[in-house]
């Protein structure tokens, strides 16, 4: 189903798949990384089945062969125009994108860097030097910091979108991917300030808000008719799937891993102790209101919510098995 470097973002039974996403192909690369982590002895399979696809993606994205993606002189990707919605924040209301993110969205830049860095490592392992990008990667890290780093009276964080002539400085969770991906584009000494801002503005017991409450356009509740709900979908509404990236970033930045694991388990306790008995019984909803009490909404059993919550638990168990076992035992007894 790969076509001109693009992975479908929607599969159709009749074969007319949708290819209107800038990030699906880059998430494919991440999925291959997860497979390699889980099955380190299957590098031969990756070379045979996945490596050609990854090279196809990089060739088309980096060569300007994807209609809505254009590489710039520094190696980053500009996507879309004011009338498109090509990232996961893709809601449309009254014929216009609710969350315009044309230009260089921070997670697209992070995913692209991660894809290039992974390809560089595979090219080294497979003896294909023509696919190595070491010098380009070093330069991209410096450019990324200059473009996206924001300092205001409340601290430092990463802008959500960079465009020629300015940046979107609203605080959104997409900046987490610059820390959490296998090859992070942000330098390690910057992690703490980003996480501090995300924790203060976006973190809830059920996931992360899509926009800080102090921002213009913040919608505290997911309610009303279709247009009103679409207006709120990525404008403050909480998404559980983002907990995976948040937990990964916290663990990567942690100087006290056991303490960080305990903090994360305390934070998500209501999600597992209370929510699993609400909405879709035994499952995790798609979204929650941005404001307390964070009522669940959307799909009552959402695959990506479940998947990333399970991945987070796996990461925490791997990082501190004893602490996780204690938490799990208490959870089964109904304790805290």
Question: Which residues make up each language-model segment?
Answer:
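Acidic, mature catalytic/reactive cores of soluble proteins
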Residues: 1-336
């Amino acid at each position: 189903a790969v076509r001109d470097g693009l992975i479908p973002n929607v599969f159709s039974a009749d074969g007319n798949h949708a290819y209107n996403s800038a990030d699906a192909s880059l998430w494919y690369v991440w999925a291959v990384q997860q497979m390699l982590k889980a099955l380190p002895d299957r590098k031969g399979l990756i070379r045979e089945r996945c490596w050609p696809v990854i090279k196809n993606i990089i060739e088309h994205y980096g060569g300007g062969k994807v209609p809505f993606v254009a590489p710039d002189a520094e190696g980053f990707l500009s996507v879309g125009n004011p009338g498109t919605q090509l990232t996961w924040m893709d809601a449309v209301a009254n014929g216009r994108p609710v969350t315009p993110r044309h230009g260089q969205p921070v997670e697209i830049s992070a995913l692209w860097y991660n894809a290039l860095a992974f390809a560089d490592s595979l090219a080294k392992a497979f003896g294909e030097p023509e696919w190595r990008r070491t010098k380009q990667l070093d330069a991209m890290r410096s450019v990324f910091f200059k473009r996206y780093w924001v300092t205001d009276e409340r601290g430092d964080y990463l802008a959500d979108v960079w465009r020629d002539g300015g940046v979107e400085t609203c605080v959104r969770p997409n900046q987490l991917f610059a820390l959490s991906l296998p090859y992070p584009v942000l330098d390690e000494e910057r992690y703490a300030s980003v996480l501090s801002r995300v924790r203060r503005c976006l973190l809830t017991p059920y996931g992360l808000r899509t926009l800080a409450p102090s921002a213009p356009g913040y919608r505290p509740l997911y309610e009303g008719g279709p247009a009103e709900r679409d207006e709120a979908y990525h404008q403050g509404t909480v998404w559980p799937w983002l907990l995976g990236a948040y937990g990964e970033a916290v663990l990567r930045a942690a100087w006290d891993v056991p303490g960080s694991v305990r903090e994360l388990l305390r934070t998500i306790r209501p999600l597992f102790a209370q929510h699993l008995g609400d909405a879709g019984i035994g499952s995790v909803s798609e979204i929650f209101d941005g404001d307390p009490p964070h009522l669940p909404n959307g799909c009552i059993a959402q695959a990506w919510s479940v998947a990333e919550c399970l991945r987070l638990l796996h990461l925490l168990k791997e990082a501190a098995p004893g602490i996780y076992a204690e938490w799990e035992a208490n959870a089964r007894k109904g304790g805290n």
